[in-house]
UniProtKB/Swiss-Prot annotation:
GO terms for molecular function: transcription coregulator activity. It comes from Mus musculus. Disulfide bonds: none annotated. This is Transcription factor SPT20 homolog. The gene is Supt20h. Required for MAP kinase p38 (MAPK11, MAPK12, MAPK13 and/or MAPK14) activation during gastrulation. Required for down-regulation of E-cadherin during gastrulation by regulating E-cadherin protein level downstream from NCK-interacting kinase (NIK) and independently of the regulation of transcription by FGF signaling and Snail. Required for starvation-induced ATG9A trafficking during autophagy. The modification Phosphothreonine is found at T491. GO terms for cellular component: SAGA complex. One of its GO terms (biological process) is positive regulation of gluconeogenesis. Belongs to the SPT20 family. The keyword Cell membrane does not apply. Keywords: Developmental protein, Gastrulation, Phosphoprotein. Disruption phenotype: Mice show gastrulation defects in which mesoderm migration is defective due to deficiency in E-cadherin protein down-regulation in the primitive streak. A weaker mutation named droopy eye (drey), which affects splicing causes incompletely penetrant defects in neural tube closure, eye development and gastrulation. Residues 442-451, 477-486, 502-513 have a biased composition (Polar residues). The lineage of its organism: Eukaryota, Metazoa, Chordata, Craniata, Vertebrata. InterPro entries: Spt20, Spt20-like_SEP.
Length: 530
């Protein structure tokens, strides 16, 4: 099947090419009158036999213009005026002068659509029949299109002319049948059908009934060559630049913008206003300008007196809490709190270590992911740990502050995981002593510090969630590193010597190494509010 179609296409190409180069001559009856189609064909054969004046050019074109010039056929004149003048129709009278009958704006383009399709408009049938000169040629009408839109001289404008053949359609044939049968005679339905068939035979083009695929391919090829630039997408593009479309755009530009485009209109006007502004900026040559900044006076005299109270800032001392005296431990005490939670598809297990070293009254904390193989490493005190581990420990303060840190971290993990949290506690350091020795040791180790007892109270910094942690869409919990970054001190814990006496006063350098957040009363008030 595909091979037969390919052969038919090749045959159609050969027929079209041979008809353009050497069209065959037709024989007509001597008594018969030639129709306009036969005249056009004879003119086509005649032009093909002539040699072109310029090579690569053909003479068998513009046949309708040549036929009108040879036989002076009557035509329907259509004038296309520039701008908003519209278009008009003219008919020729008996005296040979043309008279304008209809003038319409470009917005009413129904007649132009019929002219573009080379079809006879049904609304002009009655007007053309009443014309003083016979304008019909075998049911067709020759229209001359005079285009004045490309003329530059408005006083005596010239025009570009071309001719088209308006063919009758079924709608015009129905109008003809109705006008013929509207007299006083009685027409039966059979008479009307017979009249319609005769009109179709008289106006229709020759029909080829050869049952060959090549005939259909040839007809399609000829139709394509004639209508290749008359497709719907091309018409849509042309309508954007038609006179009616340009007039509509011009009217909209002068009128007020719709409510939906007020912002666009404002931006467009502001852009035009800025484009119209011109700034006369001139850069003078070097040496011609005066530096006013260098010429301004500069007073650099040293003041004799300085108001210290105006620039100084007094920091209030931290009030002491005598209800809980500072305890000097007799040994290292380490408490491990393991928090386990499982939310969704994730499992989290972190460990909070609270440590009080020997000879140090302060508690330190460390948060890390829990691992079984790190049990030995976690037993090291911050004073004996390496320099790399100092950044992981943060200062907590007293025992009450350590309990508060545990509660806050448990609430933090539970809020982030949005599920119940299991906490397990294990302590080391004091378990090696007997109950009696532990009581005696605690009694002898409870000593007030000469410095810390005078109003120094260490409070842990408040635990705050990061701004984006609560809105995280990934579902990750608050990690140990994030919590430790909010709890740890910017300074590492002090390294206490084992030989330091418990009765001696605390060195002032140790107090200065505490974080400002841990010592400030503002952080303590924020923690109580949280």
């Amino acid at each position: 099947m595909q091979q037969a179609v390919e052969q038919a296409l090749d045959c159609a190409e050969y027929i079209v090419e041979s008809a353009q180069q050497r069209p065959p001559k037709r024989k007509y009856l001597s008594s018969g009158r030639k129709s306009i189609f036969q005249k056009l064909y004879d003119l086509y054969v005649e032009e093909c036999e002539k040699e072109p004046e310029v090579k690569k050019l053909r003479r068998n074109v513009n046949l309708l213009e040549k036929l009108v010039m040879q036989e002076t056929l009557s035509c329907l004149v259509v004038n296309l005026y520039p701008g908003n003048e519209g278009y008009s129709l003219m008919l020729r009278g008996k005296n040979g002068s043309d008279s304008e009958t209809i003038r319409l704006p470009y917005e009413e383009g129904e007649l132009l659509e019929y002219l573009d399709a080379e079809e006879l408009p049904p609304i002009l049938v009655d007007l053309l029949e009443k014309s003083q000169v016979n304008i019909f040629h075998c049911g067709c009408v020759i229209a001359e299109i005079r285009d004045y839109r490309q003329s530059s001289n408005m006083k005596s404008p010239g025009y570009q002319s071309r001719h088209i053949l308006l063919r009758p359609t079924m709608q015009t044939l129905v109008c003809d049948v109705h006008s013929i049968t509207s007299d006083n005679h009685k027409w039966t339905q059979e008479d009307k059908l017979l009249l319609e068939s005769q009109l179709i035979l008289a106006t229709a083009e020759p029909l080829c009934l050869d049952p060959s695929v090549a005939v259909a391919c040839t007809a399609n090829r000829l139709l394509y060559n004639r209508q290749k630039m008359n497709t719907r997408p091309m018409k849509r593009c042309w309508k954007r630049y038609s006179r009616s479309s340009l007039n509509r755009q011009q009217d909209l530009s002068h009128g007020p913008p719709p409510p939906q485009l007020r912002l666009l209109d404002f931006l467009q006007k502001r852009k035009e206003r800025k484009a119209g502004q011109h700034y006369d900026l001139k850069i003078s040559k070097a040496g011609n300008c005066v530096d006013m900044w260098k010429r301004s006076p500069c007073n650099l005299a040293v003041p004799s007196e300085v108001d210290v109270e105006k620039y100084a800032k007094v920091e209030e001392s931290i009030k002491s809490d005598d209800s809980q005296p500072t305890m000097w431990p007799a040994h290292d005490v380490k408490d491990d709190y393991v928090f386990e939670c499982e939310g969704g598809n994730q499992y989290q297990k972190t460990k909070l270590t609270i440590l009080q070293s020997l000879g140090d009254p302060l508690y330190y904390g460390k948060i890390q992911p829990w691992k079984a193989d790190e049990e030995n490493d976690s037993q090291m005190s911050p004073s004996h740990s390496s320099a790399d581990d100092h950044s992981n420990w943060f200062v907590i303060g007293s025992k009450t502050d350590a309990e508060r840190v545990v509660n806050q971290y448990q609430e933090l993990v539970q809020n982030e995981a949005k599920c119940p949290v299991k906490m397990s506690h294990s302590s080391s350091g004091s378990a090696a002593l007997s109950p009696g020795e532990e009581a005696e040791q605690a009694e002898t180790s409870s000593i007030q510090s000469s410095v810390l007892g005078k109003g120094v109270k260490h409070r842990p910094p408040p635990i705050k969630l990061p701004s984006g942690s609560g809105n995280s869409s990934s579902g990750n919990y608050f990690t140990a590193q994030q919590a430790s970054s909010f709890l740890k001190s910017p300074t590492p814990p002090p390294s206490c010597k084992p030989s330091l006496s418990r009765k001696s006063s605390v060195d002032l350098s140790q107090v200065s190494m505490l974080s400002p957040a841990a010592l400030s009363p503002a952080s303590s008030s924020q923690r109580h509010e949280s």
